[in-house]
């Protein structure tokens, strides 16, 4: 009996010691390792501090899911808006001929050399090597900022610009692209006064202000020799027609249109309608590949169905449709398709 009582007392004592030990350990652990239970840790600062990080992750996730490559409402190169456009568009082809893409594929070389055949052949690469000692030979559009929206106006030469009043709207774009003669003085209210890019070939070339990029559209190796000459010695004065022996343009802003891009338009877009695409189409697709948003002015006939230039008084000149080189009707069809695909907006003029 005495032994049983002794065992019972010892058991109770050990149990009480064990319980007290647990209580002490829990209390000490709570104070030492759970600071978020401290009243100071429950203020609004800590709760608010967590929210922006999570919200930021949500915004980043939405941006990634949207897949947009620019800050415009719609971005030109982003797929999904039109199956027709996506099946034709190739964003990997540079519209600018540079040191990096100087070597043309054989099929492109043959096609380009036959656009305006010359009696005397020239080594294209050697000509380009010399030319790129005078002009940059770089692609200024290689890097695009996804946080910006590059808006471009492609301004054609149609008579439908007369009386349109588009001038201020045109001048509001980042890039304003014109072609060939395209006078602005005296027509500012309708065509605008600013120009950032002017596309010409030797036979249509004119002097440009220092802040304008001259984009040469070459149809033959002689055109490359001409621009090198026009910016240096002035020796070349004739191709198949008289050309300017000297040209006043900013050498640092001279760009050369890529024949491979030229053929890409002919193959993919105009689908061999006409011998080759018109200058207007070349400029339009240049814009489609370097811009985020493209608005088109001065293309097609006027409201009476006449084809003429906006600076011509003869409304019935219709030179564009009489050349036999370009298929005007098919090019109008392509422009209409691009507009329906929401890739461009066309301003029909007067």
UniProtKB/Swiss-Prot annotation:
Glycan attachment points: 211
Membrane topology: Single-pass type II membrane protein
Any GO molecular function: protein homodimerization activity
Residues the record lists as binding substrate: 116, 157, 180, 240, 276, 280, 300, 309, 326
SS bond partners: 70-75, 72-149, 152-291
InterPro entries with a match to the protein in the record: Beta-gal_alpha2-3_sialyltrans (IPR051757), Glyco_trans_29 (IPR001675), GT29-like_sf (IPR038578), Sialyl_trans (IPR012163)
Coiled-coil ranges per UniProt: none
EC class of the enzyme, as a word: transferase
Cellular component aspect of the GO annotation: extracellular region; Golgi cisterna membrane; Golgi membrane; membrane
Residue intervals on the Cytoplasmic side: 1-6
Pathway terms, separated by semicolons: Protein modification; protein glycosylation; Glycolipid biosynthesis
Keywords from the named record: Disulfide bond, Glycoprotein, Glycosyltransferase, Golgi apparatus, Lipid metabolism, Membrane, Secreted, Signal-anchor, Transferase, Transmembrane, Transmembrane helix
EC number in record: 2.4.3.4, 2.4.3.2
Catalytic activity of the protein: a beta-D-galactosyl-(1->3)-N-acetyl-alpha-D-galactosaminyl derivative + CMP-N-acetyl-beta-neuraminate = an N-acetyl-alpha-neuraminyl-(2->3)-beta-D-galactosyl-(1->3)-N-acetyl-alpha-D-galactosaminyl derivative + CMP + H(+); a ganglioside GM1 + CMP-N-acetyl-beta-neuraminate = a ganglioside GD1a + CMP + H(+); a ganglioside GM1 (d18:1(4E)) + CMP-N-acetyl-beta-neuraminate = a ganglioside GD1a (d18:1(4E)) + CMP + H(+); ganglioside GM1 (d18:1(4E)/18:0) + CMP-N-acetyl-beta-neuraminate = ganglioside GD1a (18:1(4E)/18:0) + CMP + H(+)
Role this protein plays: A beta-galactoside alpha2-3 sialyltransferase primarily involved in terminal sialylation of ganglio and globo series glycolipids. Catalyzes the transfer of sialic acid (N-acetyl-neuraminic acid; Neu5Ac) from the nucleotide sugar donor CMP-Neu5Ac onto acceptor Galbeta-(1->3)-GalNAc-terminated glycoconjugates through an alpha2-3 linkage. Sialylates GM1/GM1a, GA1/asialo-GM1 and GD1b gangliosides to form GD1a, GM1b and GT1b, respectively.
Family in the record: Belongs to the glycosyltransferase 29 family.
Descriptive protein name: CMP-N-acetylneuraminate-beta-galactosamide-alpha-2,3-sialyltransferase 2
Chain's gene name: ST3GAL2
